[in-house]
Amino acid sequence: MKKVLDKLFVILPFEKPFYDKHSMEVEYPGNPLLDEISHYSATQNKEEFLKEHNLGAKPIIALLPGSRTQEIKKMLPLQLSLVEKFPEFDFVVAGVSTHSPEFYSQYMEDSNAKLIYNNTYSILNSSHAAIVTSGTATLETALFNVPEVVCYKANPLSFILGKYLVKIRFISLVNLILDSPVVVELLQDLCNRDDLEKEFRKITFDENNRVEMRYMFGKLRNILGNAGASANIAKYIVEDLRK
C-alpha cells in the first residue's frame, strides 16, 4: 500500500496509529456515519414515524439481526425469543429490502414482533434498547444513544481461525473504538437464550447500567469527532493538489 498510495484516509480513529507505525501518510477525517445521522436527525419526525407504524404505547426494543442471509437465520430466532417473555415492550425488527417479507415471516409468523423495512435509523431513534448483530449497526446504535447487547455466531472453524489470525480483544466497533468492554458481546456459545435474556434485563431495567453505557457513548462521540468526513477529505485533497 505504501508504494502505491500518496495518502490514506481512514474512517475509524484506531486505524490511524496502526498506519502511522508503518510510516504511511494517513489522516482520520471523521466517520461518515456522523454525517448520515446528522442529516437524518435534521429531516425526520419521531412522532410521525410512531403514528405511521402504530407504535409508542410501549417502549420499543430494536432487533437488528443483520443483512446477510446466514446471520439473519442464526440471529433472528434468538432475538425473537425475548418477545413472549417481555410483553411490556414492542419489539421491532429492522428489515432490509434484499430479503422478502416471506423470508422474515418464516421466523416471525408466531411472533408479536413488528417488521419495518428500510427504517433502521427511525427505529433506533425511537428505541429504549437494542439487540444488535455485530457490524456497523453496533456503532449506529451507540450514536443514537441506545443501550445495546451485541450478538454474533460464526462458523466455529472460521471463528477459531479468525481469533488465531487477528489478535483483537473485541469484535464490536463500539468496544474497539473505546478500547473497553462497554457493550456486552455474546459470541459463539455465549450467544444463547439464557445469556441474552440476562443481558437484556440489564440494558432495559438496570438504570445504572443504562446511564453508564450512555455516558460511554458520549465519550465515543468525542473520539469520533464532528460530522463532515466527506468535506474534510475534499479539503485535504485540494490542499495536497495545491502544493
What does each model-found stretch correspond to?
Residues 1-243:
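Nucleotide-activated sugar donor-binding and catalytic core shared by glycosyltransferases
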